[in-house]
Structure formats: C-alpha cells, structure tokens
Amino acid sequence: MLLYPAIDLMDGQVVRLQRGEAAKKTIYSTDPVAIAKHWEAAGADWIHLVDLDAAFEGKSRNLEVIRAIVAAVSVPCELGGGMRDAASIEAGLATCVRRVIIGTKAAEPGFLAMASATFGPDRLAVGIDAKEGKVAVKGWIETMELTALELAREAVDIGIRTIIYTDIATDGMLQGPNIVAMREMAAAVQCDLIASGGVSGPDDIRELATVPGIHGVIIGRALYEGRMPENLRSILE
C-alpha cells in the first residue's frame, strides 16, 4: 500500500475543500514546497498534487509552484486538475511530474485514446470521481449517467494502468472512506487502484490495505488536522 499525501493548490496556497466546494475552503499553508518536503520526510511514497484553479476555471495559476515542488522532493509526484486537452496535459508533464491525472475529459469518447497514444499510458492516470456511483465532472459540478465502473473498464481497456477513485460524499469529511464502493471498484478492474476520499485516521488506511487490488491511498485533510502519526510508514507496520 503506497501513501499519497495530497497537496491541493489554489492561488499558490495549500488548501482543502469539503466535498469539492470552493466556498468551503480552508487555507493550510502559503508555502507548498515546505509542505511537500515535510510529507516526504514523514514517509510519503508519492505526492498527489491538485491544481484547483485549473480544475474550476480551466486555467492554471500554479505551474511554477508545481515545478518547484517536483524539484524539491525525491519521491515522484502526480498532478490533477484541468487536464482537458493535449496542451494542458503537455503543460502539466512539462513540470516534470511523473504522470498527470485526467478527470473530466476521461468521460469524453475518444479523449483517453488520443491522450494515451500521444503521451503514453504510463504518463497518465484516470481520476474517477463519483456521486452515488455515477461519474461527476467539471469540478464535481455535473453528474453523468455513466457509472464509475463503466469508465474504469473503458480506461483499462485503453491501456491505462492507474485509476484514482474518489467518493465525493466522503471527500474532506473525515468520516471514513466508502469501503463498499472501493471494494466494488477493486474487484471490477485489473489496475493500480488508488483510493481517495474520507480517510480520517490510521485505522481507515489499515482497512483499505486489506482490500485486494487497492494499490495506494490519498490522504488529505486528516494529515493537515493532525490525525496521522509523524511517521506515516508506521501506520502499515
């Protein structure tokens, strides 16, 4: 089980949202590079970066900060938020992150196949955000009829190896992950599945680690509110 501390960026600051709502924003730090180095020292396997400005507005204000984070840490980084065309994917990869996460556009017919052919499936992950099992897009503002399981199968068929699955109802709420949904997804697709949303403490991570097929977990608000041990690796020992 790999640990992915999350750094959500808005206007160059580290923030957390509740259920993805920009109005429910908490600013945790004005120094994202220091935060990334702190999580690396704590035992992060990856750093999970989200460009919220790009996600909500389609335009990034954080690329220089992201580039600085990647340069400052030795663990790999991944970047999500606003990956809606080839140019934005190229700009994201130009920050030297290991891979970018395609969310909204993954549900558009043909887009994933194009991105995979252009950039290679190893440089891409698919972020599937779900409300009651249905795919949510455009910063979680719209919900589609497409189910999360259907989209996951399509992505794997194209050659995508990493899927990040977020249950929106639990995200940022510190009430525990949706284990049932995570089990369903892990059983449905053969890929590196990363669970996201709702982790409230070490016990949630230990429970996710018992689910076959879950490769990693993204930890957000619980980290910033002191609910995790200083040594993150000790959770799984």
Whereabouts are the PLM-identified features?
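Short, acidic/polar
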Residues: 28-40, 84-90, 144-154, 205
